[in-house]
């Protein structure tokens, strides 16, 4: 592994966790981020992921982080995906209770842009998609708890519509 991939973005998260992709490896896609994307990933770690990890004291597995344009296209990501900017990550959640706990904690304690609890009932996959914009003032605090994605793998970004404010989401949970 080269030095760039070993780079710590925060105490518990490395660049390689954001860039590793079996699909990219299989297809020979170079999924290396640029400097701005690395800064955005660091911001996401500092603002949301690291505080979440510190609070629960357990490892968090990123299933999809940074995606170059070619990889995003292959996995069916949306054209303006925040994954391509280094602003988004999908997190594996072992069960719905953990998803609910993490979701509520993120809404109440972090400055995020978008938070979706996504799931595919046919494939029985569930994950949290979260993002944080580089410019903190532009974070929308869009949170949708029960966002169903039709038969999509956890590395695919949802195409959701609608939103609620952090306060509304807290009351809905």
What is each of the regions a protein language model found here?
Residues 55-57, 84-88:
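Short connector loops at helix/strand junctions that flank enzyme active sites
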